[in-house]
Structures are given as C-alpha cells and as structure tokens.
Regions:
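Cofactor-binding active-site loop characterized by glycine-rich and histidine/acidic residues
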Residues: 3-4, 8-140
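Glycine-rich ThDP/TPP pyrophosphate-binding loop and its adjacent helix/strand module
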Residues: 34-35, 83-218
Length: 218
C-alpha cells in the first residue's frame, strides 16, 4: 500500500523488492527479539527497497504510521533510498545497489560476537564490490549472513536470459561461502535455512528463490 500511494501520485517507487523480503525480515527480527545474538542494525544492499524499512520503523514504534502516506514525497524524509539523517528509524544508508557488503564486513570486524545480517538481491550480487567483499569475509571468517532475494528480475530484465551461466549460489560457494538455498515463499524452509546459517560461525548465504511480488497480479 505504501508504494501504491507513491505510484498513484506519480512519484514512482518499487513494490516487488520490499514485498519480497518481508518473510525473512520478520524471521530475523523475531529471532533477535528471542535472544539470538544478531546485530541490531538493518542492512539492505538494495536501497530501493526502502519502503520496508519505513514500515518496519512504524512497527517498531520509531515513526508515526501517517508518514507512510508520504513515501517519496519531497521533504517527507521517506526517500527512495533510505537516509539515516532524515529519519530515526533508518540505521544505515546503503547507497546504490550492491554497495553495502563491504560496510557490513566492517561491522562484522567491530562486532565479532554477533551475527551480522545483510539483506541482498540477485541484482546486487552482480556488482563487483560484492565479489571483493565475499572474498574478504571468507578470508577473515567474518560472521556475516547474506539473505538474498533471488527473483530473477533486475532493471535490465531476467538474468537467466541476458547473463547465461550466472548463478548466485554457485558464485558465492566458489568464493568460499556456505550456501543454503530455499523456496523463499515456503516459510518452514526459509526459517530452517536462516536458523542453520546462524549456527555457523562464518560467512553464510541463504538464497531465497521466489517470483517477484508473489500474489500480486501483473
């Protein structure tokens, strides 16, 4: 609904991405609240999914729900990419797509006793920065968990059509990550993969295969 209001006003915005990663966000937040040692900041390498962070801010009592009606409006603070200096509910500004993993590694170096969660995407994983960050995480056994929305959709189309042979899981496995793959809309599978990742001290990727915006008519 938040993204729909913006579109109706001609402000644009993204619906599929933030809608996709609601299940894994709820699972991680619940595990953290239940006492699992997960760093409390929210890192999303796909900043255009900012709508979810704003909704999460409301749920966590850090923002009034009325503000959601002004998503992407100038001066509202609810920018298309999240900016922490504009809203208290935003932990981290990820910049453009695919540029968060290196920063997340830094957080992992500074917080070795907690798991550091990064929400990723198949599109972001095509960026070269991620390859460098993955190798650094493996070399230092950083306790990072990349939960990746793999919906086979990017702004350029479907990766399976224009980048033959590219596979997120195989790529990360080749770089040394432990990889779990699940149906992102099978919540039992998703929960199991996330909890397994948290039992491992070191870099793990959970690849969530799904259709973008499940249940939303095209």
């Amino acid at each position: 609904a938040t993204t729909a209001f913006a579109r109706a006003k001609g402000l644009g915005g993204h619906t599929g991405g933030p809608y996709d990663i609601v299940p894994e966000t709820l699972i991680v937040d619940s595990l953290r609240e239940g006492g699992t040692k997960i760093h409390d900041e929210f890192f999303d390498e796909a900043g255009h999914r900012s709508a979810l962070q704003y909704v999460r801010g409301v749920v966590r009592g850090k923002m009034d729900s009325e503000k959601l009606l002004h998503y992407r409006e100038y001066g509202s603070g609810l920018a298309g990419h999240p900016e922490p200096e504009l809203l208290d509910c935003i932990d981290f500004s990820t910049g453009r797509l695919g540029h968060a993993a290196g920063h997340v590694n830094g957080v992992a170096f500074a917080n070795p006793d907690s798991a550091i969660i990064m929400y990723g995407s198949d599109g972001a994983q095509m960026e070269g920065n991620n390859a460098e960050a993955a190798r650094l995480a493996v070399a230092n056994n950083l306790n990072v968990k990349w939960i990746i929305d793999d919906n086979n959709v990017t702004i350029a189309g479907h990766p399976e059509n224009y980048m033959a042979g590219f596979d997120v899981g195989n790529t990360l496995e080749g770089q040394g990550f432990k990889v779990f793959t699940c149906d992102g809309e099978n919540y039992t599978e998703l929960y199991d993969c996330i909890t397994k990742s948290l039992e491992i001290n070191g870099p793990v990727a959970v690849i969530c295969k799904r259709v973008m915006g499940p249940g939303i008519p095209e």
